[in-house]
A protein has these predicted regions:
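Solvent-exposed, non-transmembrane loop/terminal regulatory segments of multi-pass membrane proteins
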Residues: 29-75, 179-189, 432-433, 452-495, ...
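Juxtamembrane segments of multi-pass membrane proteins
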Residues: 435-557
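Transmembrane alpha-helices and their membrane-interface boundaries in multi-pass membrane transporters
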Residues: 305, 321-337, 356, 360-417, ...
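Extracytoplasmic
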Residues: 155-276, 281, 575-682
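Hydrophobic transmembrane alpha-helices and their membrane-interface caps
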Residues: 285-331, 695-742, 775
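Pore- and gate-forming transmembrane helices of large, multi-pass membrane proteins
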Residues: 289, 341-376, 750-780
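Signature of alpha-helical transmembrane segments and their immediate interfacial
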Residues: 2-37, 404-459
Length: 818
């Protein structure tokens, strides 16, 4: 190899020119890359219909757009009055903002419009409108029921409505629409059950997946509340509470951003301080980071070319995984450091001949581990695997072929002879701890055997980045406002809006018997507010002509408990005649009513395909049992049978929580299989490269031991493993393979050699850099980052220690050489 060039000569080297050209191409690709957070990237390649429904609800469902608001405190003699005033002013401000499609706080803002709408369209909305109901016998029975209401608490309202609605359609519809449980009222607005909190429900216009829009909406709520506090007497001590999917998303994003910035800055300071202590040169430090930056650029570009977009999770995980690349430059600069008696070029040639083959084998080992992800059925894992492979290979190639030219001819690092000598003595003594390691592994295996049933988490909630106190506040506010859980859904596809509505009506007819028997507490249905055209026509056809209806009403008033004259119902006959002539109800007619919001949420269209959704409510259980049992669940078999009886192809009953957990379990199983396949590939690679089963086992043993001990530690701490732990273990193997290979390295003899002092120092520095980079994540407030830090930090350190303990004994003459 030629003498490493310096100054401008380095940039005329073919390898450097090719590297610069590659960076330019990567920059062009990255500049045109779109980054996405769409969860469909982490669906299987061929997702089930249920999984599609799950992602649609997470992205754009009604619940994803809800912000639950609480107002606590408020000074003065009557804090409840202060909170009510704040609630009214806050609601009024938000209702005028286009960012919100609905604001509910208990005020009867749309009640008058809703009642007028129901009154005007009662004969197309009421499921009771049938030919039988408007026969002479049916009218007689309906009129009798309405007359009975005159003696009840609703008598005044019934008396006023009787001339227009003797069949009681309005009363039945209003009762049906108001059937859901509402929060209690205090001073005219919603309040918590204990009366210590005013509550509101805001529905954003933007989808829940639009985090930026959700952040703007949340900021609007805060500013509106602050303005209301300033304008309301005795309100200075009032406190605003918010929760909901959008709030969680924004808070999590901000927390992750803050933690990543804080911990990254701290880890960067530690790594820079560590490397400067060894390198003594800022220039060498900057050069050492070039392989990492090059790997990141190449990884992003490769995924962009292969998939069209780069998922945010892939970028986050991949950037963390590629942290292994910083080790390569450490090996180069420390292991090839020249002395006053050795020319830099000779030292570099010796490094390439002696150490590069081992590093290259370590890179291939890491590639084998990550390559297993390329066979995943989940595009998200394929992205992660491709990103890591391209990044690591690029970083290794830059270290081998570019850095030698850029570093110059005169590179000296701090004299590490004393540290190397101490590490050599420690390494020689390390094998004495083998029996201690054996006992540790026996204990780890015993712990894993005892905790095998609960070792892996089977619920997606295990990955939740939401802190426990935020989850508790969410549960409290949901209980206060009765917000929908929307765990259970029946989804009916349709080629058109009318087809979806007709399907919803058929399924509703099958579900109603379950409500009548108590197997189902109730369900929502878009066709309740917007019946299909066919149903509307059938109901209008049930209305008799005016002359026929007049004669039937004369018969209906006979033998009633209260005597009424047929002439009293002239307005009723006129209303029926008007209904027969009016056009069919359309979606636009609901504008301005609360029912329009329900239809918009339950009847959706995407890519020309319509879907009607029927959220189901599980039967309630008594308060005592809720303290000891799980929340109520539905009889899934009965629901599916009812849906099947509707004879609608494509109709689905979906338990969103169960589907999310099932999807997560599939991820875990897929990852375990791929991890095992990757481990087998690594073993085969080492066996071929090392040409010895014994050396292969020696190289693998420290990695397996580190993974076992880390896993046992989680089991003993009662921490269930998740997909994040598994990815962390894969990184332990990737990083630890370099340590194990160096301790099993041969240098021109048939026997393994004791690692040289500079090699031991390079391994220690690389390990400390890895621990600084990953270990600090253990102090993150975000559970996902904390999990990754607790896995990789200790695992990397244990891999180095175990590699030293299990290293083969060196030949006597090689001790002297070392």
């Amino acid at each position: 190899m030629r003498e490493p060039a310096n100054n401008t000569r380095a940039y005329r080297q073919p390898a450097v020119l090719l590297w610069l050209l590659g960076l330019l191409l990567c920059a062009i690709v990255i500049g045109r890359t779109s980054f996405t957070a769409d969860l469909s990237a982490f669906l299987p390649r061929s997702p089930s219909a249920e999984q599609r429904v799950l992602v649609d609800q997470l992205r754009e469902g009604l619940v994803s757009r809800l912000i639950l608001i609480g107002i606590e405190g408020g000074g003065g003699d009557d804090a409840a009055t202060t909170r009510a005033a704040l609630s009214r002013q806050l609601a009024a401000t938000l209702r005028a903002d286009a960012q919100f499609s609905a604001i509910n706080n208990g005020e009867p803002v749309s009640e008058a419009r809703d009642r007028q709408f129901v009154f005007e369209h009662r004969y197309v909305l009421s499921p009771a409108v049938t030919p039988q109901r408007f026969s002479a016998e049916g009218l007689h029975q309906a009129l009798g029921d309405s007359l009975d209401l005159l003696a009840s608490s609703a008598g005044l309202v019934a008396k006023n409505m009787l001339p227009h609605d003797p069949t009681g359609e309005v009363a039945a519809l209003v009762s049906q629409l108001d059937s859901t449980a509402l929060p209690s009222l205090s001073n005219g607005v919603w309040a918590s059950r204990d009366g210590k909190r005013a509550v509101l429900v805001a529905q954003t216009s933007a989808a829940g997946s639009d985090t930026d829009a959700q952040a703007r909406a949340i900021d609007t709520v805060r500013r509106a509340f602050d303005a209301a506090v300033r304008a309301t007497p005795n309100a200075a001590s009032a406190k605003l509470l918010m929760t909901g999917p959008g709030v969680f998303s924004v808070d999590t994003r901000d927390t992750i951003k803050h933690d990543v910035e804080r911990l990254s800055a701290l880890s960067l300071v530690l790594i820079v301080a560590l490397l400067l202590t060894v390198y003594r040169s800022p220039r060498t430090l900057v050069l050492g980071l070039l392989p990492v930056l090059s790997g990141v650029a190449a990884g992003v570009a490769a995924v962009s070319i292969g998939f069209g977009t780069v998922h945010g999770l892939t970028l986050g995980f991949g950037t963390t995984l590629i942290g292994e690349a910083v080790d390569y430059s450490i090996y180069l600069f420390v292991q090839s450091a020249g002395t006053h008696t050795v020319r830099p070029a000779d030292s570099l040639r010796a490094w390439i001949a002696t150490y590069w083959p081992t590093i290259r084998l370590g890179v291939l080992t890491s590639v084998c581990g990550f390559a297993s992800m390329l066979f995943s059925g989940f595009p998200g894992l394929v992205q992660l695997g491709l990103y890591s492979i391209v990044g690591l290979v690029t970083a290794a190639m830059v270290t081998r072929y570019v850095l030698p030219h850029l570093r110059g001819a005169h590179v000296e690092i701090r004299d590490v002879a004393k540290l190397g000598a101490w590490l050599a003595r420690a390494t020689q003594a390390a094998p004495r701890l083998r029996w201690t390691l054996v006992l540790t592994l026996v204990g780890a295996c015993a712990a894993l055997a005892l905790h095998r049933d609960g070792l892996w988490s089977r619920e997606l909630a295990a990955l939740s980045p939401v802190p426990a106190h935020s989850q508790a506040l969410d549960a409290s506010l949901r209980a206060d406002v009765g917000a929908p859980d929307v765990r259970y859904l029946v989804v009916i596809p349709g080629a058109s809006e009318q087809a979806a509505l007709q399907g919803a009506e058929k399924v509703a007819a099958q579900l109603q018997p379950l409500v009548d028997t108590g197997a189902l507490a109730g369900f929502e249905n878009p066709a309740r507010y917007l019946p299909s055209d066919a149903t509307q026509r059938a109901r209008l056809a049930s209305l008799p002509p005016a002359d026929v209806l007049t004669e039937r009403m004369r018969a209906a008033v006979e033998d009633q408990p209260i005597r009424v004259k047929p002439e009293l119902f002239t307005p009723f006959i006129a209303d029926v005649a008007a209904a027969r002539a009016q056009p069919l109800l359309r979606r636009a007619d609901l504008q301005g009513t609360s029912m329009a919001l329900a239809v918009d949420a339950l009847l959706t269209e995407r890519d020309g395909q319509w879907s009607a959704m029927l959220p189901l409510r599980a039967p309630s259980i008594d308060k005592a049992s809720t303290q000891t049992a799980n929340p109520p669940s539905l009889n899934a078999a009965a629901i599916r049978t009812a849906v099947e009886h509707a004879n609608l192809p494509g109709a689905l009953f979906v338990d969103l929580k169960a589907e999310a957990d099932r999807l997560y379990v599939n991820y875990v199983r897929e990852d375990i299989r791929l991890a095992l396949a990757g481990f087998v590939a690594i073993a085969l690679l080492l066996w071929v490269a090392l040409r010895s089963a014994q050396r292969t086992l020696r190289a693998l043993a420290p990695l397996v031991a580190a993974v076992l001990v880390v896993t046992a530690g989680f089991a003993l701490a009662s921490v269930q493993l998740t997909i994040l732990h598994l990815v962390g273990m894969l990184l332990i193997v990737a990083v630890g393979s370099n340590y194990a290979l160096f301790f099993n390295q041969r240098t021109g003899t048939s026997q393994p050699s004791q690692p040289a002092a500079q090699t031991l120092v390079s391994l220690l520095v690389a390990n400390l850099a890895t621990v600084a980079g990953f270990g600090l994540l253990a102090f993150s407030r975000v559970p996902m980052l904390e999990t990754f830090g607790l896995t990789v930090g200790p695992g990397a350190m244990l891999a180095l220690v175990f590699a030293a303990i299990l290293a083969p004994k060196a030949a006597p003459d090689q001790h002297t050489a070392a």
